[in-house]
Structures are given as structure tokens and as C-alpha cells.
UniProtKB/Swiss-Prot annotation:
GO terms for molecular function: 5'-3' RNA exonuclease activity; rRNA binding. One of its GO terms (biological process) is termination of RNA polymerase II transcription, poly(A)-coupled. GO terms for cellular component: Las1 complex; RNA polymerase II termination complex. Belongs to the 5'-3' exonuclease family. XRN2/RAT1 subfamily. It is found in: Nucleus. InterPro entries: 5_3_exoribonuclease (IPR027073), Xrn1_helical (IPR041412), Xrn1_N (IPR004859), Xrn2/3/4 (IPR017151). This is 5'-3' exoribonuclease 2. Interacts with RAI1; the interaction is direct, stabilizes RAT1 protein structure and may stimulate its exoribonuclease activity. The interaction also stimulates RAI1 pyrophosphohydrolase activity, probably by recruiting it to mRNA substrates. The gene is RAT1. Residues 402-424, 519-549, 939-1018 are annotated as: Disordered. Residues 997-1018 have a biased composition (Low complexity). Keywords: Coiled coil, Exonuclease, Hydrolase, mRNA processing, Nuclease, Nucleus, rRNA processing, Transcription, Transcription regulation, Transcription termination. It comes from Candida glabrata (strain ATCC 2001 / BCRC 20586 / JCM 3761 / NBRC 0622 / NRRL Y-65 / CBS 138) (Yeast).
Length: 1018
């Protein structure tokens, strides 16, 4: 999920990062659509590697939002095949396809999965109730409904979790479909397909990241490989940047193009005709897609992140890593975002402004290869804490202005004269309910006054979405109004109706009297409270005026001291132990703790912790300090997860809320360490994240643990739980306040049941390796078949292969599922009408990644050839000098611009490439030679007026020789004077430079040498 609204914000701020996908139309012959020629040239430009985050395909295919879902699981799998085939025809990878399905996630992610799945089960229950009500209404109208339709339940989307029968069926189906394409599609003959199903631990996108890091570690890796990843998650953008593979792009649906489409509810999908279903299928097949070009985003960021007057060389790669890290505070899948940060409010720009103002005072960047410099992080967060109060006030003012603007628009709309399409104009402050001719409230309506609607606005919204607790609240208010209405009606006489000079109807007259009566009751209640308050004794009643003055002065002084020296008050009563927190006795319903916190008013700090954690004021320091420690551990874990892989499978953030920014102080000396641990088994994760309502996805032996009152872990599966809206408007944005899982108790109870599992159930509860499938036309086919499957092969033999021959590296071994040559592979889908396949047409093997020789380095590899720049000098200047509209409303979704025929070309744009060196990492040796010139360049900024920022000059020198990232100021393209052979024309000069090189690339750095320090060789 990542950062909400991040893609929308990013594409508006940097409009040239996106371009439309060009799809080749299918040819019709006698009404039959011919398949697209996969082997033909790609109108979007050629691509080497494609990575599919399959959960982003499986979810919309199995439970679509805007149309009836597939009838059976087989139909769902066929829909997955159809969608995947369309994506592949758009991207057309030529070398490698990685299909990654979410496996068991780290514990840090399970908390979010648990919240989603509990809410998903509740939403499914509401949808089933709505479906049953619709069926009852139809039967009351005399319609005959088949039992199969009437008893149909909403398919449980929680089945898309590792370990369920559906995920097992999906894995088998994906392996068959891949083999079918390799055996029958000529365009796939050289494609190598890696399938990492749900039995392989790890999230899909992070298994893809592990694969890319492994390929980069191979000595023969081509640094000019083009990559593309498909998916809708915002964190794919961060992952693309974190690879430091500039030839990278993201393929995704154009969700903005679908914003205006009608949203069908349950009733719409039930009543949908076959013609309407066909129309929706046609619309879905024409949904537009977008490219998001990481290379163009890097160009924008080179201008956005460029900072003068640095005491150290500007390093674009590390600056990008800092930018990615700052985005984590605005939202991620593992930690709650900081209360003062929201992407919609340009919070990333706020953090960037702080970073650029502080960077010259820092000794180095905040991040380095996935590790944090806590001193630098503390300085940035401390400055954010100083601005926090102003951010809350600004947000409140903007909300008020937005609300007032909406009210004005609403009022203007209601006062319009009807043109035949508008409803009858009504007064702004009148919202009458439905009444019959006798003045009684019509059946099915809520009797609410205007003040009730304002007071219970949030409950009304949630009630309309089916929330039971909100419905109860609204019904109670309505019942009170009904009682008052009956009381008023009994008191009215015929003269009251006759004296009606304004010709009100009976319903209108009763409504007005109800409003008046409620105002009287509220006034009486207010007077009673004032009277009680006046009878209470004063705090300081004394006849002596001087004593009174002294007491008032003492109170004022004490109040000032409380406000100015909060850390010194009641030091003896402050509790240093971390307090136990609770939900304040709230076990269900929808709440909004932000209403009581009032972040925009003074004193919000203490109110925040008291209202959300239900603790005493003297417990706040201990709690906030522990939360800060856990949160810093969390962002350290997330950064390592993105750049090095999972640092710990068992760590998680133990709170539902984030600390306030002003509490991030004195954490620079934290000693952050993680224990790797091991991932849960699939059934253990299912027991951690599924509610009892989804227990049918588990083997039967586990279900009593989730539903029986005698279960030792029954408290992990509440049927009712509170949801804190936390100041948000939409119900899905609320926080489900579920209890955190006790790992020891859960694993003990779960593992005690393993002995009762069947063999098939045990098979689904294992950890496996990915599989590699190739066609019999692949360059490695004969070698792999001979060593692994033909007569005389060694048992348990592992074959290591490298990148040079097939553009893929790894370790293969015999398939554990019993693949054999000269056999048949049947289709696992009954209704698919797909044939049996001969196993001589393809090869299936177990696949393992090459082990990394060392920690991954956040650098561009040797031999990289830059792409042609996409941005003009005007684009760069608009970023650097902040003119125009600060990056927004410029060229929004302007696909009229020429995007180099929609293709971002991959070098050579100039005549040079990176200089290779032993070790495979460039480490900015070239810029190391220019340290002296860099310092002179900084002195120009300090002593004279700053020179014009020239794109990737990186505040080095302005001499003529320019390398990568140093465009010609006059021509606006990349030029460079340093030469290197690296990976060009098949030479092995990649990751390890001279260690296994051929030809002149083996020179490494010896032909040039270098001067000055490198951060990896000191």
C-alpha cells in the first residue's frame, strides 16, 4: 500500500515522469480476435526484465469493485491469466520474467495485514446482509429467486493469504500457464520465467528486490539492463529508486482515468444484465495504463536535491536515498505516519526544505547503504518538531476554509432556480424528513433535525456505509425525536393548525415545533449547568483584597511556570517505567480521538497521549520516550528492508499510533540491533492475521482455537473491536484497535495441532524455493537437461550459472515436485479448455539466488551508459528556483508532449560510460579527483553570487570534461571525457571489474588511477 496519494502527488509535481502505454490493437478475422504477435517489435521500446507483483493482479481479478465477481475460483484464475497476458503484451520482456506472489510476511507487516483482514471480514458480513435484504425485497415483490443465487455468499478475499487452498491452486495454475506459454508462443522461446509462489517467504515486491540485488552481485551482470515492475503500490517507486538501476520503469493502471466511472453497489451488481456485464468487460479491457520512468524522476530529483555550500561532495545517489527515507515518515506499511505529516499537505516538501537547510551543517548524509546516521536524523526531526504546532494550526485553518467553501457552493446550488434537472429549490437550513399526509414519519426514515445532522455527521456517514454501531446511535437520536414529536402532537389542538398563517403542511409544522422544543430543552440544560456551577464555592474567597491579589499572582506565576518549564514540574511524581496502555474500556464502535485531542490548540501534546493511550499525565514522558525508541528502530528496520533485505523477521512496532514529532530528541546514541530470526510458517501467519470468520481457510484442527471459548488464545480473535477515525473522513482510513499477537502463546497453541494435519495439509505448510521454467529453445536447455534430468545425472546436484550467456544468474537443481522429461502436464483448471503439455517442450527446475558477496552498495554499477535526458533547462530551472506554480498544475496529465516517441532511450547518449574498477562499484572515483575544484566551487557560492545551477553539475567544477550526470550547459545533453570499456558488446567488465574481465575492460582503474578519498576504500 505504501504512502496514500503519493503517486497522485508525485505525478502532479513532476509531470514528465509518466507517459501513456501504447497498446497494439488485436486484429479481427471473421469476428475472431487474433493473438498479438509477442515476438514483434514493442511500440513502447524493448525491455529486458519484467517483474510482476502478482497480488496486484489477483485481488482485482478475484473480487473486482465495479462488476460482479467471477462465479468460481477457476473463473478467477482464468481472469488472472487474461490480465497477466495483457500486461505481458504491453511490456514484452525479452530475457527474464519474475512472477512473485506474496509469501509469509515479516512480523512488522503482519500487524497491518491483521487489521485489513479483520475489517475485510466485517465488510463481507455487511455485504452479505445487504444481499440478503435485497433478496427478501425481491421475494416480497413476487420474484422467484433460485436457491443457488439466494444463498450465495460474498467470496472471502482473505483467502489470498499464504497457506490457503486457493493460494495452492493459484501456484499450480501459474506454473501450468507459464509452461503453456513457453511451449506454444514463439515470442517466449528465449524468456526465462521465475515463479516465486506463496510458499517462498517474503512479500512479492521485496522478493523481486532480493532478485535484483542478487543479479547486480554477479560479475557478468550487464549494468545497462532495462527493468520494469508492474504494480499499484506507491512503495514500488521507492523500490525502483533504491535499486540504483536508472534504466527502470513502473507499469501501472491509470487509476485517474477511472475516477469518473460509476461505482456499482451490491444491488447494481445483482441486477446487472448480461449486456451490462459485457459492456463492463469491454471497458476493463480498454483501461489505459501508464509508464512511470524512474530515470526521469532521477532527473527531477537531481535538481530538487541539489544543495550548495556543502562541506562534503554532493552525492546524488545518497541524496536520493535520503529522500526515500524521509518519505517513510509520511506513510509506509510497517509504521503509522507521524501525525503532522500528510502527503496531501505537501509534507514531503516540508521535510525536503528542512533537509536542505540542515545538510550543510551535517557531517554526512542521513543514510548510507540502508544504515542510518542517527545524529543527522535527530537534527532533521528536531526541526520538524519545532514546526509541528504551526503545521497543526495551518491544517485546521485550511480545513475550516475548505468547509466554508463547500458550504458556500452547497448554498449556491440549493438556491439555484430549477431548470428541469435540478430539484425543487429549498432553503439552506431546512432538511425535512419524509412524512405522510397525517404528519407521521414515513417508514424507513430517520427523524433528525438539522442540528442532529451537523452533530452526528460522522455517524451518519458511517451508518450509510452499514456500520452497526453508528446505525444504533442514529436510531437512538431518531427515537428521542419521535418521542418528542408524539408529545408535541398530543399537545396540539385543531386551533394550532387553523392558526397556521404560513400555510405549512402538518409535517412542516411538526418539524418546526420539534426544532423549537429541542432548543428549549438544550437551553434548560445549559441553565441548570450554570446554576450548579454558580453554587460551588470559589477557590479563593477572602474578604482581604490584598490576599486575593497575592493568590491571583501566585496562580498566574504557577501557570506561567507550567507552560515554560514543563520538564521541571512534578519531577518527583513522573513515572519512568513504560506504562500499560488500553482502549479506555471501549470494545467496539467508531470513535475519533482527534476530536478530544484538538491538535490545533495549545496543550495538544499531553492531550494526544492521554486520549489515545488512556494514561496519566505523569506517565507521558516514559511512554513517549519508549515510543520514540521503537519508532526509530522501525524506520531503521524499514530502510534496511528496502536496501539490504529483511533485518529481522520477528521485530514489529508495538503501538497503533506514532509519537509526536517534538518528542524525537536525544535518540542519537541508541544502539539499534536486530536479530534475524526466521519467518512464520504459512499456517502460523494465517493464525496471526485472520479473524474467526475466515477460519474456513485454515485446516479444521485450527478453527476451535479461533472460536471456542475454551481456547487459550481466544482473546486474539475479537468479533467486535473499536475503530479510531483518528481525524480522517473515510471509514477505510480508520485505525482498527486490535490486540497485538503474543508470538509465544500463538506458536505454542498452533504447533500443538500439527500432529493432526493430513499429508496434503502439511504440504501447504512448508517453505520452498522459487522455480525456473525455460523453453526447449533456450541457450541453457541442453546443459540443464543433461546435468539435471537425463540419464547419468547426479542426485542433489546444484548447477551455478552466470549472467553472460543468458542474462540470468543463479543456482538450479532438480525439481522437488517430480518433473520428468517425456511426460505430460495436465491443465489444473477444469473449465479452461487448455490442453495437456508435453514436458519435452519446457524445463522446470528449483532456483536459488546467488549469495551476495557483501552488503549491497547504493551506487550505480560500472559500465552504465546514461539515457538521453528528458527534461529541458526550463524544467530544471522551475524546480531549482521554484517559479511557476511550485511544480503543480503544470502539464498535468499532458500526454500531448512528445516523450521521445513514448520511449526513454537507453544509452549510449554520449560517447562515454562509467569507468570500471575492481570491486564493481564506481564509488565516485572520478569526482574524487575533483575534490579540490569542488571546494573552490563552494567558495564561489560563499564569496560571490551563486552561478546558474547546471542540472547534474553536483557543485563540483565547471571545467569542460564532464562525466555521467554532468550535462553540457549549452547543448543540454550528456557529454563526458573519461573513457571506460566496462560492459559493452558482451565484455565482462561489470560488477567486479577486472577480476574476471575479458579484453581491455580488465584494465580496471589502473589505466587512470585516482586521487582523493572514497567512502568504501579508506
Amino acid at each position: 500500500m505504501g504512502v496514500p496519494s503519493f503517486f497522485r502527488w508525485l505525478s502532479r509535481k513532476y509531470p514528465k515522469i509518466i507517459s501513456p502505454v501504447l497498446e497494439e490493437p488485436q486484429q479481427l478475422v471473421d469476428g475472431v480476435a487474433l493473438p498479438i504477435d509477442y515476438a514483434g517489435p514493442n511500440p513502447n521500446g524493448e525491455l529486458d526484465n519484467l517483474y510482476l507483483d502478482m497480488n496486484g493482479i489477483v485481488h482485482p481479478c478475484s473480487h473486482p469493485e465495479n462488476k460482479p465477481p467471477p462465479e468460481t475460483e477457476d473463473d478467477m484464475l482464468l481472469a488472472v491469466f487474461e490480465y497477466t497476458n495483457r500486461v505481458l503484451n504491453m511490456a514484452r520482456p525479452r530475457k527474464v520474467l519474475v512472477i512473485a506472489v506474496d509469501g509469509v510476511a515479516p512480523r512488522a507487516k503482519m500487524n497491518q495485514q491483521r487489521s485489513r483482514r479483520f475489517r475485510s471480514a466485517r465488510d463481507a458480513e455487511i455485504e452479505n446482509e445487504a444481499r440478503e435484504e435485497i433478496m427478501r425485497q425481491k421475494e416480497q415483490l413476487g420474484q422467484i429467486i433460485d436457491d443457488s443465487v439466494k444463498n450465495k455468499k460474498t467470496w472471502d478475499s482473505n483467502a489470498i493469504t499464504p497457506g490457503t487452498p486457493f493460494m495452492d491452486k493459484l501456484a499450480i495454475a501459474l506454473r501450468y500457464w507459464t509452461a503453456f506459454k513457453l511451449a506454444t508462443d514463439p515470442g517466449w522461446k528465449n524468456l526465462q520465467v521465475i515463479i516465486s509462489d506463496a510458499t517462498v517467504p517474503g512479500e512479492g515486491e521485496h522478493k523481486i528486490m532480493n532478485f535484483i540485488r542478487s543479479q547486480r552481485a554477479d560479475p557478468e551482470y550487464n549494468p545497462n539492463t532495462t527493468h520494469c515492475i508492474y504494480g499499484l503500490d506507491a512503495d514500488l517507486i521507492f523500490l525502483g529508486l533504491a535499486t540504483h538501476e536508472p534504466h527502470f520503469k513502473i507499469l501501472r493502471e491509470d487509476v485517474f482515468a477511472q475516477d469518473n466511472r460509476k461505482r456499482n453497489n451490491v444491488k447494481d451488481t445483482i441486477d446487472m444484465t448480461d449486456e451490462e456485464k459485457d459492456l463492463i468487460r469491454k471497458q476493463d479491457s480498454e483501461k489505459p495504463f501508464l509508464w512511470l520512468h524512474i530515470s526521469v524522476l532521477r532527473e527531477y530529483l537531481s535538481a530538487e536535491l541539489w544543495t550548495p555550500k556543502l562541506p562534503f561532495p554532493f552525492d546524488l545517489e545518497r541524496a536520493i536515498d535520503d529522500w526515500v527515507f524521509m518519505c517513510f515518515f509520511c506513510g509506509n506499511d510497517f509504521l503509522p505516519h507521524l501525525p503532522c505529516l500528510d502527503v496531501r499537505e505537501n509534507s514531503i516538501d516540508i521535510l525536503l526544505d528542512i533537509w536542505k537547510s540542515i545538510l550543510p551543517r551535517l557531517k554526512t548524509y542521513m543514510t548510507c547503504d540502508g544504515k542510518l546516521n542517527l545524529e543527522s536524523v535527530e537534527m532533521v526531526l528536531k526541526e520538524l518538531g519545532n514546526r509541528e504546532g504551526d503545521i497543526f494550526k495551518t491544517r485546521h485553518i485550511q480545513e475550516i476554509r475548505k468547509k466554508e467553501a463547500n458550504e458556500r457552493r452547497k448554498q449556491q446550488k440549493q438556491q439555484n432556480v430549477s431548470t428541469g434537472q435540478d430539484r425543487h429549490p429549498t432553503k439552506f437550513n431546512e432538511q425535512l424528513q419524509m412524512y405522510d399526509t397525517n404528519g407521521s414519519l414515513a417508514k424507513g426514515s430517520w427523524n433528525l433535525t438539522t442540528s442532529d445532522m451537523v452533530r452526528y455527521k460522522k455517524e451518519l456517514m458511517l451508518a450509510n456505509e452499514g456500520d452497526e454501531n453508528s446505525i444504533k446511535i442514529i436510531e437512538e437520536v431518531s427515537e428521542r425525536n419521535n418521542s418528542l414529536m408524539k408529545e408535541i402532537q398530543s399537545e396540539m389542538t385543531p386551533e394550532d393548525y387553523k392558526g397556521n398563517n404560513n400555510n405549512f403542511t402538518a409535517a412542516e409544522l411538526l418539524k418546526k415545533k420539534l426544532n423549537a422544543r429541542k432548543r428549549e430543552l438544550e437551553k434548560e440544560k445549559e441553565n441548570e449547568e450554570q446554576e450548579r456551577a454558580s453554587k460551588q464555592p470559589k477557590i479563593s474567597e477572602t474578604p482581604d483584597e490584598s490576599d486575593l491579589t497575592e493568590e491571583i499572582e501566585a496562580d498566574v506565576i504557577a501557570e506561567v511556570e507550567d507552560e515554560t518549564t514543563p520538564d521541571e514540574k512534578d519531577t518527583d511524581s513522573i513515572i519512568t517505567e513504560v506504562p500499560e496502555i488500553s482502549n479506555g474500556g471501549i470494545t467496539s464502535g467508531v470513535i475519533d480521538t482527534d476530536e478530544a485531542v484538538k491538535l490545533f490548540e495549545p496543550g495538544y501534546h499531553d492531550r494526544y497521549y492521554i486520549e489515545k493511550f488512556h494514561i496519566e499525565p505523569n506517565q507521558i514522558p516514559a511512554l513517549s520516550k519508549h515510543m520514540v525508541k521503537c519508532y526509530i528502530e522501525g524506520v531503521s528496520w524499514v530502510l534496511m528492508y528496502y536496501y539490504q533485505g529483511c533485518a529481522s523477521w520477528t521485530w514489529y512496532y508495538p503501538y497503533h499510533y506514532a509519537p509526536l514529532a517534538e518528542d524525537f530528541v536525544d535518540f542519537h546514541d541508541l544502539d539499534i540491533k536486530f536479530e534475524l530470526g526466521e519467518p512464520f510458517l504459512p499456517y502460523e501467519q494465517l493464525m496471526s492475521v485472520l479473524p474467526a470468520a475466515s477460519g474456513h481457510n485454515l485446516p479444521e484442527v485450527f478453527r476451535p482455537l479461533m472460536s471456542s471459548e475454551d481456547s487459550e488464545i481466544i482473546d486474539f480473535y475479537p468479533t467486535e473491536f473499536p475503530i479510531d477515525m483518528n481525524g480522517k473522513k473515510m471509514s477505510w482510513q480508520g485505525i482498527a484497535l486490535l490486540p497485538f499477537i503474543d508470538e509465544t502463546r500463538l506458536l505454542t497453541a498452533t504447533r500443538n495441532q500439527y500432529k493432526f494435519l493430513s499429508e496434503d495439509e502439511k504440504r501447504r505448510n512448508t517453505r520452498n524455493d522459487p522455480v525456473l521454467l525455460i523453453s526447449n529453445k533456450n541457450v541453457n536447455y541442453e546443459k540443464f537437461a543433461k546435468r539435471l534430468y537425463k540419464k547419468g545425472h547426479e542426485d542433489n546436484f546444484q548447477l551455478v550459472f552466470h549472467h553472460f550467456k543468458s542474462s540470468l544468474a543463479g543456482i538450479v537443481s532438480t525439481d522437488t515436485e517430480g518433473f520428468k522429461l517425456h511426460a505430460k502436464l495436465p491443465c489444473p483448471i477444469q473449465s479452461g479448455a487448455l490442453p495437456e503439455l508435453s514436458t519435452n517442450l519446457f524445463l522446470k527446475m528449483q532456483y536459488k539466488l546467488l549469495p551476495l558477496p557483501s552488503a549491497n552498495k547504493s551506487l550505480i554499477l560500472n559500465g552504465f551508459i546514461p539515457s538521453e535526458p528528458m527534461l529541458t533547462q526550463h524544467d530544471f530551472d522551475s524546480i531549482v528556483y521554484k517559479y511557476g506554480t511550485r511544480g503543480f498544475q503544470r502539464n498535468q496529465r499532458n500526454f500531448g508532449m512528445e516523450m521521445k516517441q513514448n520511449i526513454v532511450p537507453v544509452g549510449p547518449s554520449g560517447t562515454t560510460q562509467y569507468k570500471p574498477r575492481i570491486g564493481g562499484y564506481r564509488s565516485f572515483f572520478y569526482f574524487g579527483q575533483l575534490n579540490q575544484q569542488m571546494h573552490q566551487h563552494n567558495q564561489v557560492y560563499q564569496q560571490n553570487q551563486a552561478p546558474t545551477h547546471d542540472r547534474y553539475r553536483n557543485d563540483r567544477s565547471d571545467r569542460g570534461g564532464r562525466g555521467y550526470g554532468r550535462p553540457d550547459h549549452d547543448r543540454g545533453d550528456y557529454r563526458g571525457d573519461y573513457r571506460g570499456d566496462g560492459y559493452r558488446g558482451g565484455h565482462r567488465g561489470g560488477y567486479r571489474g577486472g577480476s574476471r574481465s575479458r579484453g581491455p575492460s580488465s584494465r580496471g582503474i589502473s589505466s587512470r588511477g585516482y586521487s582523493g578519498p572514497s567512502r568504501y576504500n579508506r
